[in-house]
Amino acid sequence: MIIRSPEPEVKIVVDRDPVKTSFEEWARPGHFSRTLAKGPDTTTWIWNLHADAHDFDSHTGDLEEISRKVFSAHFGQLSIIFLWLSGMYFHGARFSNYEAWLSDPTHIGPSAQVVWPIVGQEILNGDVGGGFRGIQITSGFFQLWRASGITSELQLYCTAIGALIFAALMLFAGWFHYHKAAPKLAWFQDVESMLNHHLAGLLGLGSLSWAGHQIHVSLPINQFLDAGVDPKEIPLPHEFILNRDLLAQLYPSFAEGATPFFTLNWSKYAEFLTFRGGLDPVTGGLWLTDIAHHHLAIAILFLIAGHMYRTNWGIGHGLKDILEAHKGPFTGQGHKGLYEILTTSWHAQLSLNLAMLGSTTIVVAHHMYSMPPYPYLATDYGTQLSLFTHHMWIGGFLIVGAAAHAAIFMVRDYDPTTRYNDLLDRVLRHRDAIISHLNWVCIFLGFHSFGLYIHNDTMSALGRPQDMFSDTAIQLQPIFAQWVQNIHATAPGVTAPGATTSTSLTWGGGELVAVGGKVALLPIPLGTADFLVHHIHAFTIHVTVLILLKGVLFARSSRLIPDKANLGFRFPCDGPGRGGTCQVSAWDHVFLGLFWMYNAISVVIFHFSWKMQSDVWGTISDQGVVTHITGGNFAQSSITINGWLRDFLWAQASQVIQSYGSSLSAYGLFFLGAHFVWAFSLMFLFSGRGYWQELIESIVWAHNKLKVAPATQPRALSIIQGRAVGVTHYLLGGIATTWAFFLARIIAVG
């Protein structure tokens, strides 16, 4: 038996009025830093102001104060999110054709933006069907609103106003919990209470209330909509909630109320809590009854999880105990000390959260098309492409952010004197083996994946198709992926006897779901072309990981610069007189990692866009013949680099290049402008600081000559500022170019 000292009671403690509210203070730029508050001597001041405004570590070393600032900033972030949501719902209420779309989602496109004719730009208002002219949107909000049971623009107005009220509340909370009642450090470090509340409250009750909404409001309203009832005739949401008989007409077991629940006769609820799998043939989305069932199940799991951790009652898990018990025969001290790291370094905590959230976001991207959750989402190809691309980019950025904050943790918060032989220490001690092996893997993947393409290009150029790697010559079939597909396709009735359909049509099985003559989803065949591009994915991901991981593992020291920790997170070089030590800071690794993240995500979204247009998306005739958008050309065209350039980039860019004079012309302008932003970045990435300083001195001389010299001395951007401006424009330009290219193409042909 383990004898424990009695747990200290958790007391909720706050400091009253710790920081006075002062508008004069806030109005003084740089008030958070003694140096910056003095005002500008040189133009570097404005850059430092932006760099340090949110770097709370640089304002104070007091962990409690830092925690309060972060906590308060989170409320500000939530306020912005509510404001943005309110704007989306307001546009749906004020400027959209939502009610028309609801009545005929297969023939009318979603639009929630009408351009005002100020300088003749009303050409952008294209005909989206049903006599409505506006910009076609691809955010998926209409499909989400339908799934929620929203049937009128008035309901959207009310929701928009509600979100505004919440935005104001969040702003108030951010002020209140910093200036009026600020929590003490112990409150931020009480992880068991935090886990219980977040798991049971946010995730558990959140999922439960959503399940309740779906059962009582969404399901009945969608039943009526699917049956073709005019949205204006459908009872209002509160009528379903207050009047059980209304629901009982649609789902007879509702008449029995909660009796089946308490008598454990749960199968009575199988009418509206189903386990069907597959897609609803009417809407092309997952069965809403499956989704309600899922949220109910998730709610139960999280409500249980939210009661697992030990607080005032002396029962349950203690996180510290779990972590310290977590060691194997080969892992030394295991996770000992991790509890202290994660409760005193918010960078370490944030790093883990970003890595997990980034990975989850990428998983979401892949599920949005393979298991489309909302009605009429699968046949809205523009929205499908946008949702995939959006979630892939966001996931990529979050994962790079994870590496950034892991490196900041290593530099600012890691204390090597107290860490010995735990897992982190062991990883750091054999970092050379890790990085050199990873480097070897990158070289192998790079040469072999690219080599397969170069082989194909060469054979194609020499007119020897029989010697190419392709489905019709030398086959390189992705046998493991096909095996995984097959397992899932055959699971219903075999390994998953209760399921009627496999989790996704993409696995195989031959069935196809089409809505209004358009393909929603069908089994996705994988072949040699996918095998080739998959290895490019493996290559780009491994290089990104190599750069980011090297930055983290060598953030404090390296053979080249043993005292790197003293130089901080970002520094240009190890001082004058030590050549060859530039661009080694942890910040520089994040900078380089961003470019490879961009490479990796670009290949993924290009692969997705072409594969779906070639093998999935298209129309179906009355005889059941499917005609794909690009006629299945992916398998034969994408096996050469030339094919990617000719049949994907060039062929599909025709819509954006020829968009002038049409409602898609804004995409043509964006395509051009974003290319320009991208090219502008190269000016910052390819030229050095001295070049600009020389030029500036010359310009300052001219100003002095004319007696118009400014009081603030102009300075060239520092090396790091220049690289930051460069990578920002590189990514912004690249992403906006891709966005214009994708949307002009898919709106024109989809």
Curated annotation (Swiss-Prot):
<keyword id="KW-0150">Chloroplast</keyword>
<dbReference type="GO" id="GO:0009535">
    <property type="term" value="C:chloroplast thylakoid membrane"/>
</dbReference>
<protein>
    <recommendedName>
        <fullName>Photosystem I P700 chlorophyll a apoprotein A1</fullName>
        <ecNumber>1.97.1.12</ecNumber>
    </recommendedName>
</protein>
<dbReference type="InterPro" id="IPR001280">
    <property type="entry name" value="PSI_PsaA/B"/>
</dbReference>
<dbReference type="GO" id="GO:0051539">
    <property type="term" value="F:4 iron, 4 sulfur cluster binding"/>
</dbReference>
<keyword id="KW-1133">Transmembrane helix</keyword>
<feature type="binding site" description="axial binding residue">
    <location>
        <position position="683"/>
    </location>
    <ligand>
        <name>chlorophyll a</name>
    </ligand>
</feature>
<keyword id="KW-0249">Electron transport</keyword>
<feature type="binding site">
    <location>
        <position position="573"/>
    </location>
    <ligand>
        <name>[4Fe-4S] cluster</name>
    </ligand>
</feature>
<feature type="transmembrane region" description="Helical; Name=IX">
    <location>
        <begin position="589"/>
        <end position="610"/>
    </location>
</feature>
<feature type="transmembrane region" description="Helical; Name=I">
    <location>
        <begin position="70"/>
        <end position="93"/>
    </location>
</feature>
<keyword id="KW-0793">Thylakoid</keyword>
<keyword id="KW-0479">Metal-binding</keyword>
<feature type="binding site" description="axial binding residue">
    <location>
        <position position="675"/>
    </location>
    <ligand>
        <name>chlorophyll a'</name>
    </ligand>
</feature>
<feature type="transmembrane region" description="Helical; Name=X">
    <location>
        <begin position="664"/>
        <end position="686"/>
    </location>
</feature>
<dbReference type="InterPro" id="IPR036408">
    <property type="entry name" value="PSI_PsaA/B_sf"/>
</dbReference>
<keyword id="KW-0813">Transport</keyword>
<feature type="binding site">
    <location>
        <position position="582"/>
    </location>
    <ligand>
        <name>[4Fe-4S] cluster</name>
    </ligand>
</feature>
<keyword id="KW-0603">Photosystem I</keyword>
<dbReference type="InterPro" id="IPR020586">
    <property type="entry name" value="PSI_PsaA/B_CS"/>
</dbReference>
<feature type="transmembrane region" description="Helical; Name=VIII">
    <location>
        <begin position="531"/>
        <end position="549"/>
    </location>
</feature>
<keyword id="KW-0602">Photosynthesis</keyword>
<keyword id="KW-0408">Iron</keyword>
<dbReference type="GO" id="GO:0009055">
    <property type="term" value="F:electron transfer activity"/>
</dbReference>
<dbReference type="GO" id="GO:0016491">
    <property type="term" value="F:oxidoreductase activity"/>
</dbReference>
<feature type="transmembrane region" description="Helical; Name=IV">
    <location>
        <begin position="291"/>
        <end position="309"/>
    </location>
</feature>
<keyword id="KW-0472">Membrane</keyword>
<feature type="binding site">
    <location>
        <position position="691"/>
    </location>
    <ligand>
        <name>chlorophyll a</name>
    </ligand>
</feature>
<feature type="binding site">
    <location>
        <position position="692"/>
    </location>
    <ligand>
        <name>phylloquinone</name>
    </ligand>
</feature>
<dbReference type="GO" id="GO:0009522">
    <property type="term" value="C:photosystem I"/>
</dbReference>
<keyword id="KW-0411">Iron-sulfur</keyword>
<dbReference type="Pfam" id="PF00223">
    <property type="entry name" value="PsaA_PsaB"/>
</dbReference>
<keyword id="KW-0460">Magnesium</keyword>
<keyword id="KW-0157">Chromophore</keyword>
<keyword id="KW-0148">Chlorophyll</keyword>
<dbReference type="GO" id="GO:0000287">
    <property type="term" value="F:magnesium ion binding"/>
</dbReference>
<feature type="transmembrane region" description="Helical; Name=V">
    <location>
        <begin position="346"/>
        <end position="369"/>
    </location>
</feature>
<feature type="transmembrane region" description="Helical; Name=VI">
    <location>
        <begin position="385"/>
        <end position="411"/>
    </location>
</feature>
<dbReference type="GO" id="GO:0015979">
    <property type="term" value="P:photosynthesis"/>
</dbReference>
<keyword id="KW-0560">Oxidoreductase</keyword>
<feature type="transmembrane region" description="Helical; Name=II">
    <location>
        <begin position="156"/>
        <end position="179"/>
    </location>
</feature>
<comment type="similarity">
    <text>Belongs to the PsaA/PsaB family.</text>
</comment>
